[in-house]
Amino acid sequence: TGMLAGNGTIRAGVKGYAPGKLSKEEVHQVWKAVEESLAAGALGISLGIAYAPEFEYDRDGLVEALQPLKGTDIPITTHIRNEGDGILLALQEVISVAEELQIPLHVSHMKCIGRKNWGETPVKILKLFDQAAERGVKVDFDLYPYLTGSTQLVHLLPPQFQEGGTDAICARLADPSCRKEITKVLKQPSDIFENIVELAGFERIYASTLHTEKFRSFAGQSIAKIAEQFGQDPYD
């Protein structure tokens, strides 16, 4: 039993929630933090590349940031970038990262979001894992035996609208024109980001934990139901 070092925590410590690629100096700071974490006893590196600020990494950026692990038996465990319409591309991305670095890969909470992705997609996923194993990649995954997933409500937003941290997000949501732009994106299927709104619908997205006292009575209700009580469009 042990701990993993969080790649997102490391990146946030180096660059905060600022958008864009890491500079060379920032990459070296990330390497130092990774090496220090491993020296302190971390058993591997945990990634959440669907989430801020890690979604700022592209595939090559991940390979660069994880160079201290190259050729070791130190694993990466990752929430993939997209568990919906783009799940196969998202899996190919992390498999290719592990393969280039020659390190073990564990995919966290393997699932297909959206009923339209339940049919042949799981078969294709298993084929990807089998093909990777045949090439010598050490790869596995975990899953939970129920249909409900969980995440932060902010993760419903497209990645470009999450940049800059909480204050920047709140400023965007307070702007009617920005909300209109967000709504337009959320109403379209995407293999670029995990569009949970389009995949599940507001009637299947529930608020489970609300920290503000005046809103706590809405815990356990769907976003669609909450919006109805406020007389508002769920997208707002």
Language model: regions and residue ranges:
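Short, amphipathic alpha-helical segments
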Residues: K24-H28, E56-R59, L88, G119
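Mobile "lid/hinge" segments at catalytic clefts and subdomain interfaces of large enzymes
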Residues: G2-G8
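Short active-site-adjacent helix-start/loop capping segments
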Residues: R11-A12, G86
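Active-site neighborhoods of metal-dependent hydrolases
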Residues: L4, G13, Y17-K24, V30-Y51, ...
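Divalent metal-binding pocket/active-site signature
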Residues: E36-E93
